[in-house]
């Protein structure tokens, strides 16, 4: 299907659905969900993986079997310094310069700290990382992150794990308009219609985890998300009709019989 893949950091990614691995009941279910989602990119927190020689490697083996690209993240970091250190550890452990940059500002909301995030992004870009920052839906911060060289911006639709969907569609549209890098909606997706809406707003991809891993049937939900992302992208490219206050008949009056 045209438009399914997209370019990220100079690499063609085979699907516009990015899948997180947190919250899965077990590795068997996670593997089934990854395959059902058709994703080409999965995120992994460094602290969830034993990457030392002789370590369990269960999650890494699973990712390798599925043939998808691994994107380490800096989950659990609250300062720029912590995030930079974790990014370096991930680069050494996984042999990748890619990092999903997370710098959390508050334990209750899990929303990003924009000041620390921008500081960490600038430092990591200067050190040769391909930086994909989890950010708020603030268009100005998104533009600043793009300006310092981030390969994409990843605004939250709503707080992580909340399932509230896209709380501020207008800001997501503004972000799409003010940056030239890919926009990946990250966090807050609850069901397939949320993912479709994100794509209809112009996002290049959607990243989600809890919506699949904590669903009653993770594999079925992964399948639903796959098609929702594809449908949303097609709808965005097709162009929706303008919203109108009054009705507009689809059938013309020409040829109507005189009764």
Curated annotation (Swiss-Prot):
UniProt cross-references to Pfam families, sorted A to Z: ThiG (PF05690)
Keyword annotations: Cytoplasm, Schiff base, Thiamine biosynthesis, Transferase
Location(s) in or outside the cell: Cytoplasm
Active site positions: 100
Binding sites annotated in the UniProt record for 1-deoxy-D-xylulose 5-phosphate: 161, 187-188, 209-210
A GO CC annotation given for this chain: cytoplasm
Top-level division of the source organism's lineage: Bacteria
Name assigned to this protein: Thiazole synthase
Organism: Salinispora arenicola (strain CNS-205)
Lineage: Bacteria, Bacillati, Actinomycetota, Actinomycetes, Micromonosporales
Gene: thiG
């Amino acid at each position: 299907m045209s438009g399914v893949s997209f370019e990220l950091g100079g690499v063609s990614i085979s699907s516009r659905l990015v899948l997180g691995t947190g919250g899965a009941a077990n590795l068997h279910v996670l593997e089934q969900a990854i395959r059902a989602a058709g994703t080409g990119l999965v995120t992994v927190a460094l602290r969830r993986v034993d990457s030392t020689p002789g370590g369990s490697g269960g999650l890494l083996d699973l990712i390798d079997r599925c043939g998808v690209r691994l994107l380490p993240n800096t989950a659990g970091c609250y300062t720029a310094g912590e995030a930079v250190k974790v990014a370096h550890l991930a680069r050494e452990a996984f042999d990748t310069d890619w990092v999903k940059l997370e710098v959390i500002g508050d334990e209750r909301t899990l929303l990003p700290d924009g000041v620390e995030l921008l500081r960490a992004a600038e430092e990591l870009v200067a050190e040769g990382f391909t930086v994909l920052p989890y950010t708020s839906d603030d268009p100005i911060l998104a533009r600043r992150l793009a300006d310092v060289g981030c390969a994409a911006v990843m605004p939250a639709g709503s707080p992580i794990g909340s399932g509230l969907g896209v709380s501020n569609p207008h800001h997501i549209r503004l972000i799409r308009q003010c940056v030239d890098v890919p926009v990946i909606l990250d966090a807050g997706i609850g069901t397939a219609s949320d993912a479709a809406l994100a794509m209809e707003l112009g996002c290049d991809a959607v990243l989600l985890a809890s919506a699949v891993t904590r669903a009653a049937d993770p594999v079925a939900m992964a399948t639903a998300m796959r098609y929702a992302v594809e449908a949303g992208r097609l709808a965005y490219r097709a162009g929706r009709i303008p919203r109108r206050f009054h009705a507009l008949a689809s059938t013309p009056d020409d040829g109507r019989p005189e009764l």
